[in-house]
A protein has these predicted regions:
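Acidic, PIN/NYN-like endoribonuclease modules and their adjacent C-terminal/linker elements
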Residues: 87, 95, 102-110, 114-137
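Residues at secondary-structure transition points
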Residues: 20, 37, 59-62, 88-95, ...
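Short, flexible helix/strand-to-coil boundary loops that buttress conserved ligand/catalytic motifs
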Residues: 15-16, 50, 120-123
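Short, well-structured N-terminal submotif of metal-dependent ribonuclease cores
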Residues: 1-38
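Short, flexible loop segments at the rims of nucleotide/cofactor-binding pockets, characterized by
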Residues: 13-14, 56, 84-90
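Short, hydrophobic alpha-helical packing/hinge segments within bilobed ligand-binding/sensory domains
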Residues: 25, 97-98
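Alpha-helix capping/helix-boundary segments
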Residues: 10-11, 42, 115-116
Length: 137
């Protein structure tokens, strides 16, 4: 079974855009099509982003917290990995995702962030639509 790290932007998109590829990935996750790998840092970032004022029109604080708990229930929660020998992410704030993907040896780091997608030559990075298509093959 494939294993994947979903970037925070994918998890947020899945919640606020229920008809998109990111939301369909969560349906596939619940159907057992792949294993989701998360870490405390990823979960903390997800919670922090969903608590931002600009997301109030999409989700309440209570519903955001419930969503994070569902993600925890449906995922393998790994310890935050140590930093790698050198950053390779274009954005230092994304380095923890790269480190998690490397240490957990996932089949894909799934992101909608162009800077993360630019790492394709060094990591198995896919967009939500690409990863969804790979599950359907």
């Amino acid at each position: 079974m494939p294993r994947a790290v979903l970037d925070t932007n994918v998890l947020v998109s899945a919640l606020i855009t229920p008809a998109g590829a990111s939301a369909r990935l969560l349906v596939e996750l619940r159907a057992g099509a792949f294993e989701l790998v998360v870490s405390p840092a990823l979960l903390a970032e997800l919670r922090e982003v969903l608590h931002r004022e600009r997301f109030r029109r999409y989700v309440s604080i209570e519903d955001a917290d419930a969503y994070v708990e569902v993600i925890i229930r449906d995922a393998e929660v790994m310890e935050d990995p140590p930093a790698t020998s050198g950053p390779i992410a274009g954005d230092p704030d994304d380095q923890f995702l790269v480190d998690l993907a490397r240490v957990s040896r996932v089949d894909a780091l799934v992101s909608g962030d162009a800077r993360v997608l630019d790492l394709r030559d060094r990591l198995p990075v896919q967009s939500p639509a690409e990863f969804l298509a790979s599950l359907e093959d």
